[in-house]
Amino acid sequence: MPRASAAQTTSQARRRTGPAPCRLASPSVTDVAPLATLLDLRPLGDDAFTAPTHGPDAGVERVYGGHVAAQALLAATRTVPADRSAHSVHLAFVRSGRPGLPVRLDVTRDRDGRSFATRRVTVRQEDAVIMEMMASFHVEEPGDDWTATPILDVPGPEETPGRSFLHELPTLGVFDWRVTGETVPGEMDATYPHWVRTVEALPDDPAVHRAVVCGMTDIAAVRGTMRPGFERGEGGFTGASLDHAVWFHRPARADEWMLFTMDSMSNHAARGFGIGRAWSADGRHIASWAQESLIRHHGGAE
């Protein structure tokens, strides 16, 4: 088990202990929207919704895909019966989103069965598709409960400082993100463990937490698919998520510490592939995911 304290009774109590989260500067702090604002979906009718993005002066050139993934999963969840929760999500990142423009989320009800429901979500900005999502929802049923892989034995979040290179992505300041377990400081390991939670406390709605966890899995996904031994100082690169799949195994609170790992599996033809896992601080296997990323080192083809 990691050297982390067990989950406390409430996320509010957790916020009052330990070091302050790694808060990120940006060219215009007011343009970095709080997470609650990003998750404020407004219905347009006929299973369509709109949601905001960060402002145009938030210090980034494109919308963080994890935020859009969380919005899309929330939109899909609003169209299914309350007794069903998402167990798998498949995402295709079609093109980069632009900060300052709202997104439109159109949900298609592909199936409503006795135990499962399937939804497709198309996310657009100004009529251009930026993401496609397929999500499956399942009624909770009794069954076996076990996990093959235990949580890693790494320093706990209170012993791990936030990573300063996130200043490159100020919109991720809504998350408190701490990399741990590096064998060589500043160098990528094949397994890339990091603690993460939201900076702000979230409502008790399990659908909100599941959507935020979905978005969190994209935080380090590009770096987690890079070749082991890559040093951040050895040269520039362009990275982007291409497609992403998440499987939810157990419920969790996104505003309490979770340990994420990314195992880099393969790099070829400017693409990287990795597999991720998430555990709660008390060792429950929460979710798994897989990602293919674009990793284009500077000097390559445009």
Please identify what each model-predicted range represents:
Residues C22-E302:
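Terminal targeting signals and extreme-terminal segments of soluble enzymes
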